[in-house]
Amino acid sequence: RRRQRQMCIRDSNSIGQVLLARRMGKRRIIAETGAGQHGVATATVCALMNMECIVYMGKTDVERQRVNVEKMKMLGATVVPVTSGNMTLKDATNEAIRDWCCHPSDTYYVIGSTVGPHPYPDMVARLQSVISEEIRKQLLEHEGRECPDYLIACVGGGSNAAGTIYHYVNDPHVQIVLAEAGGKGIETGMTAATIALGKMGIIHGSRTYVIQNEDGQIEEPYSISAGLDYPGIGPMHANLAKQKRAIVLAVNDDEAIRAAYELTRLEGIIPALESAHALGALEKMKFKPTDVVVLTVSGRGDKDIETYLSDE
């Protein structure tokens, strides 16, 4: 039967992990979410499989992503607002991990990005690799080749970027461009530009770049985008940046908003704020007329309409 899809790129990750949880005999599913997309995807799968679903979400994000919160509730999930710290994605992840540690026998934690302890970063990247599989198929159909010249994706934790580049990482002819959240500007302190400002550290079980102070304490990140508002980065992306395999650009809030409006007016596509950062990277790049450029628009902008209108 055809079912209306509640989500897009997040589905494959949630489906894979919930199926794994069921195989392991777990009855209770927990997840964290920032923009709410991963929460909706996980709640959808749990509804289909008749499994309990608890989603942790920072109180700040609950308020700015009300549409997705209501979707999760309609799907039968319990949404737990997190009031610690900056009340955003990092804090939601903290609470989800605490829950997981307290209920190891019956609970499975569906992590939404390429973060957390092994094997989560690798597992999420593999499940999201359907994105690059689809890119290869569409390029072959429309361009007569499987490889683009450039791949562009936004990065917070990095799940959609990992899926976008998965089958191209070892191809030196494909230039990878990662757009992270510059916030109000990387020099202002109100930013989530982890690769630009971060130092090597540990966050949620991963060794990666982390925004931290001189004492090693994790700093509170900021981004207009709830899904990119994270002080770490997936270890895969940290390594790509360290090895100079990827170009990393910090895209500020206003640049992302401007790029989102441009896409909407030119193509009739309203992108999520997360994807708008990838679009904002376009004006920072120079391409040849013959270059084939693939940019992943990883989510719809329905959830961000109020933010777009208030920042127009």
Language-model segment annotations:
Residues 19, 30, 38-96, 187-198, ...:
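Active-site-proximal loop->helix
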Residues 21-58, 146-160, 176-179, 292-297:
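A short, small-residue-rich loop immediately preceding and capping a beta-strand
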Residues 93-123, 145, 170-173, 178-269, ...:
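Active-site/ligand-binding loops adjacent to catalytic centers
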Residues 155-159, 163, 253-312:
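Claisen-condensing/thiolase-fold acyl-transfer catalytic domains that form or cleave C-C bonds
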